[in-house]
Amino acid sequence: MQDCRTVYNFADVIDHEFMNFIFISPHFPHTYWQFCRRLKQNGVQVLGIADAPYDELTGEQKDSLTEYYRVGSLENYDEVYRAVAYFAFHYGRIDWIESNNEYWLEQDAHLRTDFNVTTGIRNDQISSIKEKSEMKKYYIKGGIPTARQIRAAEGIDALRNFIRKVGYPIIAKPDVGVGASGTFKIEEDSQLEAFFDTVDDYQNYVAEEFITGEICSYDAIINAEGDPLFESMTVWPPSIMDIVNLKLDLSYYVAKEMPESLRELGRRTVKAFGVWNRFVHLEFFRLDSDREGLGQKGDFVALEVNMRPAGGYTPDMINYAQSTDVYKIWADMVAFGESRTQQGAQQYCAFASRRDIYQYAHSHEEVLSRYADQMVMCERMPELFSAAMGQQMYTVRLQSMEEVNDFVEFVHEKRQ
């Protein structure tokens, strides 16, 4: 346990009650200390809990916290519970508990329930945002188009009947989970049989009709009334599963503008799920062809909800695209219930990465030289993210989709 308390200028915080905010894992992902910094600048006492040694925190991470409590493992609920109890004893009532991290959402909800923290999701609501099978009920409730689905636990005969309706291929994926991990594309009967024969926990899977199109996300910060304080759209590659399995190069971008149809569906989804006080990342397909029962080419179809910010450097990319600070907008929502952060000029922010196993037509130095004026980030990716995101990333701010496409082509072009 380490104490890094600082003295506040109370003149900066006279317009809201002094609050105690426990941030779980403020050091990882490694950009998340910025949420803590903005909270602290808004006069909030930021109390960090993680399992990293205090001396391994960066100076920025330390400065963003009022106090830090190290546990042996964040996986040990009893230890984390005792850490929260320690803060409650020393600082008084805990107002918020949050990680903004998919991995810890259930633990966050458990802690809120045990400590009667009412500013976020609790145990009785967690299944609706973690289980894909539960998500479908809320999409239907909100009248939001979404892919048809069946639980694999219903058995192979039930899936055969399902396939007669929707056709091959289908996608089988864990009911609880994110990304491509544990996901199967099933294209014929033999693969369906192999899935049931080889996947020991198939009872914990769902199967969905396969939809093709761009994946577009509605990224928003939602206030206590369930209304957006900020909205943005990111366009993702159609299959992270293929990128991981086939070792493809990755690119994606934050869009300059959001179609009104996505904005309307995003807001309806927020209301259907009863979301409040959160940064959300809601995924939709943009159909690349007409699809009976779902919509026409260009329409949006719900994929899944994520009650946390988009992964990787996407929050920073949103900042560059929208000339704003989403870390600050989120902290404003917590401290003031409104955004006190300006937005400026809008543009595209594009990400493209490379893998060390390939030889590229243009050198690292050529990429830096060509995009010197537009480059906003350039670094090696952490090993944890390299399977999906490659080893070397470049992120630029651009004015048109033509420029985005040219940038991706230049970075990804292979040597002949």
Language model feature labels by segment:
Residues 190, 209-275, 279, 286, ...:
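ATP-dependent carboxylate/phosphate-activation module, predominantly the ATP-grasp catalytic core
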Residues 145-149, 169-172, 181-217, 239-250, ...:
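Conserved ATP-binding module of the ATP-grasp superfamily
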Residues 6-8, 14, 329-416:
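Peripheral (often C-terminal) accessory segments that flank ATP-dependent C-N-forming ligase machineries
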Residues 87-94, 165-166, 200-202:
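Glycine-rich phosphate-binding loop signature in dinucleotide/nucleotide-binding domains
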Residues 112-182:
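A conserved helix-loop-beta module that forms one wall/lid of the active-site cleft
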Residues 68-75, 150-154, 184-187:
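Short acidic-hydrophobic, aromatic-tinged amphipathic segments that line or gate anion-handling sites
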Residues 8-124, 339, 401-415:
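ATP-binding N-terminal substructure of ATP-dependent carboxylate-amine bond-forming enzymes
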